[in-house]
Amino acid sequence: EEKTEEGLPKDEVYLYRDALAHGHAVVFVLADSKEEADRAELTMKSAGAESLDAAREKWWVGIREPEKEHYEENGKHFDADETHFRRGFVAALHPERHGKPFELISSKLQKHYSESYHTEAFRKGYQRGVRHGRETNLAPPQVQTQSGSRKA
């Protein structure tokens, strides 16, 4: 159990939730060695499993056009700004940041996304990611605690 909690990358939770929402299975392999991990990867590939990288790109392709359209409504150039926009979008879906206003966690965002943080595209992407997380339930649900505060 302890190994499981340590091994799941939180940055990818939105991809797991998206896959499950579309009826796909999500398989986690906990390998004790590089050789074991390589064998597991080969086995998964031969069974037709999609890699996390492939799933990430497929997910983005599925939402890219509507996001591009929305971004360009104000005369912006999505193709030039896509890298920063996408970083902001994905940052908003992280379990530790979901639903939180940009201003509230700006210092953490600046620390983790120093290359993109100061761009308007990153901020716009973050705002769109927050909205997308709410609309699609890709952000982890918030739970009401007994004290009345909300917690992820």
Question: At which residue positions do the language-model features occur?
Answer:
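Intrinsically disordered, low-complexity, hydrophilic segments
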Residues: 1-152
